[in-house]
From Swiss-Prot:
Pfam families: Ribonuclease_P (PF00825). It catalyses: Endonucleolytic cleavage of RNA, removing 5'-extranucleotides from tRNA precursor. The lineage of its organism: Bacteria, Bacillati, Actinomycetota, Actinomycetes, Micrococcales. This is Ribonuclease P protein component. One of its GO terms (cellular component) is ribonuclease P complex. It comes from the Bacteria. Consists of a catalytic RNA component (M1 or rnpB) and a protein subunit. Belongs to the RnpA family. Coiled coil: none annotated. Gene3D superfamilies: 3.30.230.10. GO terms for molecular function: 3'-tRNA processing endoribonuclease activity; ribonuclease P activity; tRNA binding. The gene is rnpA. Its EC number is 3.1.26.5. Keywords: Endonuclease, Hydrolase, Nuclease, RNA-binding, tRNA processing. GO terms for biological process: tRNA 5'-leader removal.
Length: 132
C-alpha cells in the first residue's frame, strides 16, 4: 500500500495529469506522468518524491475485479517508486487500467505498467549531458 503522502488524491491533481501529463499506453494500462507543481514550488528541504494515483473504471469489471486490478497496479508502482530514476523525481503518476487489465495476470500487468512508465518518464528525466 502506498502511504497517503505518496498518493495523488485531489481531482485537481488528476486534472493536472490529464492536461499536462506525458502519456504512454499498452494493451492493459495507460500511464501519465506530469511534474508535481506542489513540489516544484516548494522550498522545503525534503527530497522530491513521486506520487501516484490509479483510475480503474467500471468498464474493467465488477468491484472484485476492479479492486484486484488496483491492488496489483499499486504493488507494481510502489516497487518502481523505490527504484531510481522514479524515486528521485518530483512527478505525479497516473495509471489508468483498460478493460483488458481484468484478464491479465500479475506478470503481464507488471511488464506493461513498467514499460509504459519508462516511456512516459523519458521527458522528465534529467539530460545525460547535465551529469557529464
Amino acid at each position: 500500500m502506498l502511504p497517503r503522502d505518496r498518493r495523488v488524491r485531489t481531482p485537481a491533481e488528476f486534472r493536472h495529469l490529464g492536461r499536462t501529463g506525458t502519456r504512454a499506453g499498452r494493451r492493459t494500462v495507460v500511464v501519465s506522468v506530469a511534474t508535481d507543481p506542489d513540489q516544484t514550488r516548494s522550498t522545503s528541504p525534503s527530497a522530491p518524491r513521486p506520487r501516484a494515483g490509479f483510475v480503474v473504471s467500471k468498464a474493467v469489471g465488477n468491484a472484485v475485479t476492479r479492486n484486484r486490478v488496483k491492488r496489483r497496479l499499486r504493488a507494481v508502482v510502489a516497487e518502481q517508486m523505490r527504484l531510481p530514476p522514479l524515486r528521485d523525481l518530483p512527478v505525479l503518476v497516473q495509471v489508468r487500467a483498460l478493460p483488458a487489465a481484468a484478464e491479465a495476470d500479475y506478470a503481464l500487468l507488471r511488464r506493461e505498467t513498467v514499460g509504459a512508465l519508462g516511456k512516459a518518464l523519458k521527458p522528465h528525466l534529467p539530460a545525460a549531458s547535465e551529469h557529464a
